[in-house]
Amino acid sequence: MLTMDDIVREGHPALREVATEVTFPLSDEEKKLGHDMLEFLINSQDEELAEKYGLRGGVGIAAPQLAVTKRFLAIHVHDEKDRLYSYVLYNPKIRSHSVQQACLSGGEGCLSVDREVPGYVVRSERVTIDAFDENGTPLKLRFKGYPAIVVQHEIDHLNGVMFYDHINKENPSYLPPDVDVFG
């Protein structure tokens, strides 16, 4: 079972590397890590387990956050209609994105960042993702709103990008016109 001790923090070189694609068939270790990542997210959203094991609540995690510079991630997040998006995605790529932008009202956080970083992180409101499941089956997934923000945050990790790299350095509270704000 993964715990917060397994997650590397900002400053670790794995968080700034561009991760390499996995090849199929996946190794047993890659499959297990994908399962463990999803289990961590589910456990972190369970109040009792989170308290028992000292887990910070998370909705997404990428392999580089575990010092594994390979292109896979897990998300476990509900949208505003309470639809669950629970996936382990291997070699995910953004196929297309909306012109309409969105952000979270309180900014973003990260399991690898132990401090609050104020500022808006503006992202695409909708994305279409091409990825593979653990068996190498191709997936085409559409995300909108909060789940879209989460999956973009995790794909950034695969490219060595941290959420705060997107914040306006001169004016963190600047919000471009016509950005939809969630939360």
Swiss-Prot record:
Keywords: Hydrolase, Iron, Metal-binding, Protein biosynthesis. Fe cation binds at residues 110, 153, 157. One of its GO terms (biological process) is translation. It is an enzyme of class 3 (hydrolase). The active site is at residue 154. It comes from the Bacteria. Its EC number is 3.5.1.88. Belongs to the polypeptide deformylase family. This is Peptide deformylase. It comes from Listeria innocua serovar 6a (strain ATCC BAA-680 / CLIP 11262). The gene is def.
